[in-house]
Amino acid sequence: MTNQRTTRDGSHGTESVPTQRSRESTDEDHGCPECNGDLVTDEDRGETTCGECGLVVEEDGIDHGPEWRAFNAQEQDEKSRVGAPTTNMMHDKGLSTNIGWQDKDAYGNTLSGRQRRKMQRLRKWNERFRTRNSKERNLKQALGEIERMASAFGLPDSVRETASVIYRRALGEDLLPGRSIEGVATSALYAAARQANTPRSLDEVASVSRVDRGEIARTYRYVARELSLEVAPTDPASYVPRFCSDLELSGDVERRARDLLAAAADAGITSGKSPVGLAAASVYAAALLTNERVTQNEVSTVANVSEVTIRNRYHEILDAGGEPGVEA
């Protein structure tokens, strides 16, 4: 079957032209049948044309988008009829309905006392239906803990999502008996932060958790082993950007600190030492070398390590980097 072709200059042809073409394809297999040029789709006009010779390959194309039009992001959000995407950060993945606590009707008017009592009963039953068994209640409590701790650290949603998936796996493989919900939730967040290269030290995690450092460490090792989590050893350099930001130091300090850590790693002095202590000492040394004064106490507070650790690592890092001594 042949289709009549029309070009922008009004000429006609009778060569065979495929009636259906990919709207966004620009490779050779879906090029212009006349000159093999790239095809361009005008969604407003419903036309697919050749960008080289102007051949109209397809006319009156079907618009697969919504039937409504929006001219800005706000209008698009208001007219969209789909809900939020599913998320592992909620125990029901965000698929259930939640009744708000505003006690107002659709027009913004305050509900009467009788209506408020009715809504309170509905909320109570709604919450019961959302968590139908002990497993869902367990998951709801744990994900709430993960959200609370991640918010305290300012961790991105990607880390929270990963931590939620790790906890779901631990729950699914029955790793919780004999361990607290808070302990497993904290270890899941600790592992997720390390996997995303935004690590937090055990001391930092323990400062916002409801369990102590020892339990977090034990639970983390158990969960990582049972779930075969791929968690690489923490790179001290991954702490440097956060420390520099908290201390309001420049990018020069951050770059110098990374160079010092790289030299220390090449010299083999980082093995068996705390990554947090190495990062703190490198930031302190880099600040002094770039004439941006910062005290050991300030670095100690931000990194949550002792000043003694900073002093010890400081001299080792300078020696490894071949830097001249700077009075601490």
Swiss-Prot record:
Zinc finger regions, TFIIB-type: 28-58
Keyword Ribonucleoprotein: no
Biased composition annotated in UniProt, kind: Basic and acidic residues: 1-12, 21-32
BP GO terms, sorted: DNA-templated transcription initiation; transcription preinitiation complex assembly
UniProt-annotated binding residues for Zn(2+): 32, 35, 50, 53
InterPro entries for this protein: Cyclin-like_dom (IPR013763), Cyclin-like_sf (IPR036915), TFIIB (IPR000812), TFIIB_arc (IPR023484), TFIIB_CS (IPR023486), TFIIB_cyclin (IPR013150), Znf_TFIIB (IPR013137)
Record-stated family: Belongs to the TFIIB family.
NCBIfam families: PRK00423.1
Protein name per UniProt: Transcription initiation factor IIB 4
Organism: Halobacterium salinarum (strain ATCC 700922 / JCM 11081 / NRC-1) (Halobacterium halobium)
